[in-house]
From Swiss-Prot:
Record protein name field: Protein GrpE
Entry function: Participates actively in the response to hyperosmotic and heat shock by preventing the aggregation of stress-denatured proteins, in association with DnaK and GrpE. It is the nucleotide exchange factor for DnaK and may function as a thermosensor. Unfolded proteins bind initially to DnaJ; upon interaction with the DnaJ-bound protein, DnaK hydrolyzes its bound ATP, resulting in the formation of a stable complex. GrpE releases ADP from DnaK; ATP binding to DnaK triggers the release of the substrate protein, thus completing the reaction cycle.
Keyword Transferase: no
InterPro entries: GrpE (IPR000740), GrpE_coiled_coil (IPR013805), GrpE_head (IPR009012)
Length: 189
């Protein structure tokens, strides 16, 4: 409230002439007080309306944030549940090939070998399409503990801590090691 608003009743008394009766001065002050009261009530009503509007906006924003969080949780859940769908679809031809191979009653060893090779190519292709790549280091490569697991150290005519042989391939998916390659490593001399 400004100084001007506080001084309104006092100004009413000051503007009253000395010839005015105390009742007239009192009536003038009451009229000014009533005007001030009306103005304050209007201001209060405006502030209450503004407060109610802000409270409503807050509740709407809160509800929207909660809905966004819930939608994000649902999307994460769906991604976990169906994220493997593409990978599973790429493995179906492999399963079909194995089923067809088992259905052949009198297959020769050559037919089995050709079928197995074709199935392995299908499997390798499915893995590569899904960013699953083999870790298959060559002999003489430097041992990398992040991608290789040393099974043993053997004396060898090569530089120490280099790979002598690969016992089992490893695999990575998008720079994350699924399984390290099992290797033997050249022992220090």
């Amino acid at each position: 409230m400004s100084d001007q608003q506080h001084s309104a009743p006092q100004n009413a008394a000051a503007t009253a002439s000395p010839s005015d009766s105390p009742e007239a001065v009192e009536a003038t002050m009451a009229a000014h007080a009533a005007d001030e009261l009306g103005r304050l009530q209007n201001e209060l009503a405006e502030l209450k309306a503004k407060s109610a509007d802000l409270a409503d906006q807050f509740l709407r924003a809160k509800a929207e944030a909660e809905n966004a969080r819930r939608r994000a949780d649902e999307e994460v859940s769906k991604a976990r549940k169906f994220g493997i769908e593409s990978f599973a679809e790429s493995l179906l031809p492999v399963a079909d090939s194995l089923t067809a191979a088992l259905a052949i009653k009198d297959a020769t060893i050559e037919q089995l070998r050709e079928g197995t090779d074709a199935t392995l190519r299908q499997l390798t292709s499915a893995l590569e399409r899904n960013k699953v790549l083999a870790i298959q280091p060559g002999a003489g490569e430097k041992f990398d503990p992040h991608q290789h697991q040393a099974i043993s150290m053997v004396p060898a005519e090569q530089e120490p801590n280099t790979i002598v042989s690969v016992l089992q391939k490893g695999y990575v998916i998008a720079d994350r090691v699924l399984r390290p390659a099992l290797v033997t490593v050249a022992a220090p001399k």
